[in-house]
């Protein structure tokens, strides 16, 4: 397999979609590792496996409709494998195997079905102290945006997934790219007060547009960096409540086609009427209760150079 992913929106040819089967029991509050799951367990609204399966089936059907080759990881018993993005990610023709949080290490073995098709020298394992998850890595052609957390309480912050060591390592293995760090606000138990991954506060769509939640960044200058790059006229800003429901976490099949949650009325209408995009609406509300949405569920392997 010849990997090729340079951005978030070029025409998708091959992707890994997470696995909804055998997710195991509902975690306790202590076992949750993101604020949205914490809230779902606290309020007894954590999703049922059959609902997760149904929603992912709808997403898969849209991918297949557009001729995308869909890979699935092996099913591991009693293991939540919905969010493929965090296990690995592709930059150009390289796949980086994430050093994910210890609670999720078992998930990586299920991706052998993909790794076995990739040349060994294109698979990169990070040094032990370099932590990164794919949700914090957003591609925009020659630019790689990386969501970071560099504060002293990093070891205590369950929702801090990517550190400065990973940022340095990625720069080393992709020397032709421009890397831009964006520091995120974090909170372990309040999903309205912190950002789990960069793709929960920022996402490029189309050729030159972006969806942004400005208050997700620890430093206001990071928001202005994005605004300067894309242009205010090309940015759709979401509210705190829309961020909570993960409006930035849409997934592009091409520069013209984006998959979005069906309840994102304001965003979906804007993308269609103002940006002229085709919006494929799917139900994904139950999955969102576990702290991720559409982009989180995918690991793109091949996109065209369009």
Predicted regions, residues:
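The feature marks the mature, well-folded catalytic cores of soluble enzymes
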Residues: 1-306
């Amino acid at each position: 397999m010849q990997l090729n992913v340079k951005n978030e929106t070029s025409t998708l040819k091959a992707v890994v979609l997470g696995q909804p089967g055998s997710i195991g029991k509902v975690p306790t509050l202590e076992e949750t590792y993101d604020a949205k799951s914490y809230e779902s367990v606290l309020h007894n609204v954590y999703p049922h496996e059959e609902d997760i399966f149904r929603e992912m089936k709808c997403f898969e059907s849209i991918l297949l409709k557009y001729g995308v080759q869909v890979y699935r990881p092996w099913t591991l018993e009693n293991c939540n494998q919905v969010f493929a993005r965090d296990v690995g990610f592709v930059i150009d023709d390289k796949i980086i195997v994430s050093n994910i949080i210890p609670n999720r290490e078992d998930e990586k073995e299920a991706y052998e079905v993909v790794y076995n098709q990739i040349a060994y020298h294109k698979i990169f394992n990070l040094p032990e102290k370099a932590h990164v998850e794919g949700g914090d890595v957003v591609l925009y052609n020659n630019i790689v945006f990386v969501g970071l957390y560099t504060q002293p309480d990093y070891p205590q912050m369950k929702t801090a997934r990517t550190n400065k060591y990973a940022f340095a390592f990625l720069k080393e293995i992709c020397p032709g790219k421009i890397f831009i760090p964006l520091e995120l606000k974090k909170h372990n138990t309040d999903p309205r007060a912190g950002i789990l991954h960069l793709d929960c506060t920022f996402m490029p769509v189309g050729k030159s547009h972006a969806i942004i939640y400005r208050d997700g960044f620890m430093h206001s200058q990071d928001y202005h960096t994005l605004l300067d790059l894309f242009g205010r006229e090309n940015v759709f800003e979401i509210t705190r409540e829309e961020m909570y429901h993960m409006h930035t976490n849409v997934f592009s099949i091409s520069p013209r086609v984006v998959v979005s949650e069906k309840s994102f009325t304001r965003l979906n209408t804007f993308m269609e009427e103002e940006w002229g995009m085709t919006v494929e609406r799917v139900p994904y509300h139950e999955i969102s209760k576990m702290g991720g949405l559409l982009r989180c569920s995918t690991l793109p392997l091949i996109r065209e150079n369009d």
